[in-house]
């Protein structure tokens, strides 16, 4: 929801309109290419009847579920070739509740994993921004959860600076 003030004419000021158009263009360009699509995806575990392919199908009604015995569910994405990125996106499947308490994100560079972020809660969608790096892969690890991890979508993007 946007809280846009109107001016004395009852209109949104031209400067506000220009800023909104710039924001729309930024978002359109940032999320135009999901570098995760078509890449090798591995998960630490997958519950019976589910598939990790749900993470990249853009369908908010499909989802991946970790096994109940997995204390730190991990999603690993290995890229065919290094690509410059700076934004990771993950979405919990909220009809089953918000479950994630904390997580970490690592990038694979020159054959070694490097932690770039630690965070708490995800909810509907979490965008994690980090310094632009040419990466060979990413690893997302749930470090604390209320129940099994359940995610509907993920992505890897390059936002303009």
Segments from the language model and where they lie:
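Short, surface-exposed beta-strand/strand-loop-strand elements in extracellular ectodomains
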Residues: 98-110
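Active-site proximal loops enriched in glycine and acidic residues that flank catalytic Cys/His/Asp
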Residues: 2-6, 79, 92, 142
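Aromatic/acidic polysaccharide-binding cleft in carbohydrate-active enzymes
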Residues: 1-18
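Disordered, acidic Ser/Thr/Pro-rich linker "stalks" and the adjacent N-terminal cap
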Residues: 21-85, 91-99, 118, 122-124, ...
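Beta-sandwich interaction modules
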Residues: 115-149
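Active/binding-pocket-proximal capping segment
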Residues: 18-23, 105-107
């Amino acid at each position: 929801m946007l809280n846009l003030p109107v001016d004395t004419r009852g209109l949104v000021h031209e400067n506000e309109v220009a800023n909104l158009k710039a924001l729309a263009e930024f978002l359109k360009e940032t999320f135009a290419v999901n570098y995760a699509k078509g890449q090798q995806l591995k998960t630490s575990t997958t519950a019976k009847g589910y598939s990790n392919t749900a993470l990249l199908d853009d369908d908010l009604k499909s989802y991946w579920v970790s096994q109940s015995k997995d204390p730190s569910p991990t999603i690993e994405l290995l890229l065919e070739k290094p690509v410059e990125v700076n934004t990771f996106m993950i979405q919990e499947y909220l009809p089953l509740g918000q479950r994630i308490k904390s997580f970490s994100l690592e990038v694979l560079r020159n054959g070694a994993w490097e932690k770039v972020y630690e965070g708490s809660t995800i909810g509907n969608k979490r965008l994690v921004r980090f310094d632009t790096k040419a990466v060979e892969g990413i690893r997302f690890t749930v470090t604390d959860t209320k129940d099994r991890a359940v995610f509907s979508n993920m992505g890897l993007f390059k936002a303009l600076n």
